[in-house]
Amino acid sequence: MRRFLQICLVVLPLLAASCSPGSSSRRPPLVSFRPQDIPLVPRTVSQINREVRIDRDYMPTSTRARRYYSGSLSPRFITIHSTANPSGDACSHAKYLNKGKSGSLCWHFTVDQYHAVQHLPLNRRGHHADKGGPGDRYSIAIEMCEVRSHSKAKTYDRAAKLTASLMTQYNIPLRNVVPHYYWSGKACPGPLLDEKRPGYKWSWFISRVDYYYRCLNGGKQHVS
């Protein structure tokens, strides 16, 4: 992780400067980063999805979240979260959602070091970012697990691959890959923030997403 952080630049302008709650009327700020200088490994979307290992386990439509909070979705953003749960892996969160224990909360993917579980179809909204605001209405939500016994680096890398795949499938620019912080000011995803705000760690994650996007798209970037 330290090696990757060293190649990243400061976030300019820092996301925190323009990411106050309800800032959806503005375009997300560009995140400055240095593209990772490692050889590209060409992949197709199908190949990278197999690497991510996406297991579908959709929430029942009878749950409160699906009945009242899961309208139609045309994705424009990808919102990155972390679970803040040191003991729950992706399957644990799937069971939690499927039993309706989350109340109104629902999101699209939970990622751990081994796989990603998909909880919602990608044409249905989640309820995860800003209480029904634009973060919910227009974004795909990815939750990253924080299991103590898991490798953080593997979890982040799997999430970066998934993000790059979704960017490619839905023509979403890197600029529109945002932390939960962008929508609500919440310090989330906590492990990828610096002093509860986007900084070097978030810049590193964005550089990783950019690397996998270039692997999928013949070396081309889609920043803005």
What is the meaning of each model-derived region?
Residues 19-56, 148-224:
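Basic/polar, cationic surfaces and motifs that engage anionic cell-wall
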Residues 1-4:
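Positively charged n-region of N-terminal signal peptides that target proteins for export
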Residues 132-138, 206-208:
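A structural motif
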Residues 6-17:
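Hydrophobic helical h-region of N-terminal Sec-dependent signal peptides
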Residues 19-131, 135:
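N-terminal catalytic cores of peptidoglycan-degrading enzymes
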Residues 79, 108, 141-143, 178:
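Soluble periplasmic/extracytoplasmic beta-strand elements of cell-envelope proteins
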Residues 135, 140-149:
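Cell-envelope and extracellular/periplasmic
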